[in-house]
Amino acid sequence: MKSKNLKFKCRLCNSPRTIDVIDLDGFPKAAQHFDLKKPDLKLDESITLMVSQCSDCGLIQLKNKPVSYYKDVITTAGLSEIAKINLKEEWLPIVEKYNLVRKKAIEVGSGRGNFLEVLESLKVEAFGIEHSLKNIKESQEKKLKVNKAHLTEFVKKHNKKYSLVVCNNFLEHQPKINEYIRS
């Protein structure tokens, strides 16, 4: 399927005014959840990535439907001890400027808890929401506070306020960006 044949509204501002930028052929249909013992040949099919830009808000985005596992996106971003120290040094001025010590922070899509650990080390009361049970278990083994949820579901059930909201390596996978940000 090529861009020209697909009706599409911007994922951020919902404008129908989008410009086709480029179609990129030959990309894998999926990038995770492969079972090498029982290969699913449908996952190995290539697709065309249809890149467009919104004429109203400027967002560059894919017109393709989101992958079925967008709530359970696996990140390869691990943090070495040196990376954690560097991140702590980067975040410390923010924590101090906005008086976040002992204040509540939530990380959306907290993965294995790498960023939660850094927040905790800065004396921020960090809490994560994550959809992957495997990641939740790993985070809880580190004594981190993580619940199973996706942001749009979480806000409907909980009326909590946070002084800081963190979203690393996750926002770009959301199909309804505007709804997600408003949550």
Language-model segments: residues:
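Short, intrinsically disordered/low-complexity patches at protein termini
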Residues: 42-44, 86, 130
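Fe-S ferredoxin-like electron-transfer domains
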Residues: 49-110, 115-122, 127
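N-terminal juxtadomain amphipathic helix
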Residues: 2-82
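Conserved SAM-binding loop
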Residues: 91-183
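Short, surface-exposed, polar/charged, turn-prone segments marking secondary-structure boundaries
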Residues: 38-39, 47-50, 79-83, 90, ...
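Short linear sequence motifs
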Residues: 20, 26-27, 63, 84, ...
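Surface-exposed beta-strand edges and their flanking turn/coil or helix-capping segments
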Residues: 33-36, 75-77, 85, 132, ...
